[in-house]
C-alpha cells in the first residue's frame, strides 16, 4: 500500500512557504505559484505528485534490498532525520558531512572500524588504561559517534539519498552525483534543482514541515521492507521482530489543489499559521507583527526576539511554559515573558485578528 498524505497536511505544516522573493533561485520559477507579502508561495499542486514520486523511489529502493541515506545537518532537521532513519532501519548523517563520505568510502570504513574498536574497549571496562586514557578514549568515541554513528552499520555506499536543504548539503549531493547515486531532495525557492533526481519543491526550514517529510520517507522505507520480505516469501508474522506497520490516519483528508476554489490563495498563510506548537523561524512569514505592542517591548527587544526566530504573535501565543523558560533564559530576559504577560497578550492579539 502506498504511503498516503494530503495537500492539507502540507499546507498546515507550512510546506508552501518559500523564501523572500529577492532571495530566490530563478531555476525554481516553474514551481512557484505566486508571491504574497514578498514571500514566494510554492505550487503544492506540483509538490504533491513530486513527493509521491520520491516516496515511491524510496519504497522501491528498500524493497529490492537497497540502502537509503537520510542527510540533514541543519539544526531544525537533525533530530527528525535521525529519528526517521532509525525508525525505518536506514542510515543518516545529521551532524556534519565529512568530505569523501561517499567518494572515499575506504577511508570512512577505516574510521568506522576505529569507532567499533573504541566501543569494544570501553564496553570491556577499558582494563589497563589510566583514568586520563579512558577519558581521551571516551572523547574520541563521542566525536566518532557524532560524525559516523548514523552510517556505522551501512556496510557500503547507499543506493539513494534523501536530502533536506540542497544548499547546505551541496557536498553530499555532488558526491552522490559523481557516483551515480540518485538523490531525492526537498528543494526550496532559494535552491538550485539541477542534478536532483527527485525534486520535491517545498519549504526546507519549518520544523513541522521537515518532521512531516521525514515521517513520510520513513513510512515509505518501512513499506519497502515489507514488500521486500513478501517478495522473498518470508512469514513476517512468524518473525521474532516483525517489521513495524504504519497505521492509516484516522481521518484521510482529501487532497486539494492550491489552484482550485477549495482553498483561496489568501487563506494559504492563515492555514499554516494555525500551529499548536512553538516554532522559531529563519524569516518572517509575510510581514512581521508589531511586537512593540507587547508590554514593555521596544525596538531593541524586538531585534532580540527576531534574532531568536520570533516575528509573529501567533508564535508567542503557541508557547508552552517550557518554551517560555528556554527563550527567556536564552535571551536573558529575567522572567519578563511571564511577568509582563506576553503570551496572554499575544493570544489576545491573535484572537482579535481572527474575529
Swiss-Prot record:
It holds the Pfam family Ribosomal_S2. Belongs to the universal ribosomal protein uS2 family. NCBIfam families: PRK12311.1, rpsB_bact. PANTHER family: 30S RIBOSOMAL PROTEIN S2 PROKARYOTIC AND ORGANELLAR, SMALL RIBOSOMAL SUBUNIT PROTEIN US2M. The gene is rpsB. InterPro entries: Ribosomal_uS2, Ribosomal_uS2_bac/mit/plastid, Ribosomal_uS2_CS, Ribosomal_uS2_flav_dom_sf. The lineage of its organism: Bacteria, Pseudomonadati, Pseudomonadota, Alphaproteobacteria, Hyphomicrobiales. Gene3D superfamilies: 5' to 3' exonuclease, C-terminal subdomain (1.10.150.20), Glucose-6-phosphate isomerase like protein, domain 1 (3.40.50.10490), Helix hairpin bin (1.10.287.610). One of its GO terms (cellular component) is cytosolic small ribosomal subunit. Keywords: Ribonucleoprotein, Ribosomal protein. This is Small ribosomal subunit protein uS2. GO terms for molecular function: structural constituent of ribosome. One of its GO terms (biological process) is translation.
